C-alpha cells in the first residue's frame, strides 16, 4: 500500500506542478482505477473496492494556502453529531500519513437511487419552501448564480421523508452555525438509497464568487 500511495501522490503532484492533466487517463488505465479531482481533493476509485481514497490537494500552496479539506470534513462530521444530523453525512476516516500526505477513506456512493423517486411531490415542495431556501440563502455564499448551486428536489424530499422536519431545522442550524457553504448537486449522492452529502468541508479558496465571510 505504501508503494502504491507514493506512486499515486507523485503522479498527481506532477500534474499539479505542470498544470497538465492530459495524462490522467493513461494513469487510470495503468492502475485500473478512476481518478477524480476538484478544487480541494483527489479521489481515487477502484471498481472492486467498496470505499474510495481521498487525498488533500495542496496545489493551492502556489497561492500561499495549504488547507486540509479532508480534516475539515472529519471535524465537521464530529460537530454534526452534536446537532444529531450526522445521518445525512457520509463519514470520512483518516487512515494514516504517507510521504507527508494525509490519506483518508470514505464509503463508495452512487449518484442514482431507486426509492426516492417514489416520494410525493407534495412533500418535496413543502420541504423546499420551508428549508431549502433558508439553507442556501444563509450558507451557500459561493457561486449563487451557478446552475449547479442547488440540490435536487428528489434528494431533499427523501431527506424529509426519512428524518422529518425537525431534522431539517437542525441541519439548517448546523450549516449556519459552522458557516458551511458550497452545498450543491455535485456534493450529494446516495448510499443504498439513503441520501448522503459526500463533501461537507465547505470552500475557503480563491475565486471571484467566493464569499469573504468564509
Model-derived features with residue positions:
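Conserved hydrophobic "DFG−1" position in protein kinase catalytic cores
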Residues: 45, 55, 105-108, 190
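ATP-binding glycine-rich loop module of kinase domains
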Residues: 31-86
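Short Pro/Gly-enriched beta-strand edge/turn motifs at strand-loop
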Residues: 21-30, 165-175
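Protein kinase-like catalytic core scaffold
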Residues: 51, 88, 104, 179, ...
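Conserved structural core of kinase catalytic domains
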Residues: 81-164
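Catalytic activation segment of kinase domains across protein kinase-like and atypical kinase folds
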Residues: 176-214
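Juxta-kinase regulatory segment immediately upstream of eukaryotic protein kinase catalytic domains
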Residues: 1-33
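Generic beta-strand structural signal
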Residues: 45-46, 97, 144, 183, ...
Amino acid at each position: 500500500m505504501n508503494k502504491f500511495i507514493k506512486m499515486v501522490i507523485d503522479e498527481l503532484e506532477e500534474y499539479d506542478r505542470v498544470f497538465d492533466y492530459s495524462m490522467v487517463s493513461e494513469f487510470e488505465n495503468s492502475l485500473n482505477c478512476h481518478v477524480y479531482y476538484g478544487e480541494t481533493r483527489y479521489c481515487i476509485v477502484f471498481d472492486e473496492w467498496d470505499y474510495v481514497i481521498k487525498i488533500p490537494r495542496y496545489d493551492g500552496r502556489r497561492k500561499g494556502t495549504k488547507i486540509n479539506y479532508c480534516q475539515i470534513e472529519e471535524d465537521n462530521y464530529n460537530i454534526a453529531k452534536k446537532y444529531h444530523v450526522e445521518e445525512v453525512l457520509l463519514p470520512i476516516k483518516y487512515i494514516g500519513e504517507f510521504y507527508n500526505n494525509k490519506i483518508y477513506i470514505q464509503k463508495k456512493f452512487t449518484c442514482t437511487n431507486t426509492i426516492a423517486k417514489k416520494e410525493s411531490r407534495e412533500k418535496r415542495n413543502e420541504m423546499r419552501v420551508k428549508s431549502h431556501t433558508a439553507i442556501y440563502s444563509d450558507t451557500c455564499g459561493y457561486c449563487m448564480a451557478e446552475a449547479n448551486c442547488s440540490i435536487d428536489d428528489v434528494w431533499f424530499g427523501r431527506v424529509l421523508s426519512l428524518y422529518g422536519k425537525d431534522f431539517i431545522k437542525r441541519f439548517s442550524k448546523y450549516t449556519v452555525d459552522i458557516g458551511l457553504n458550497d452545498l450543491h448537486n455535485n456534493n450529494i449522492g446516495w448510499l443504498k438509497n439513503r441520501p448522503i452529502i459526500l463533501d461537507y468541508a465547505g470552500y475557503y479558496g480563491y475565486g471571484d464568487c467566493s464569499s469573504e465571510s468564509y
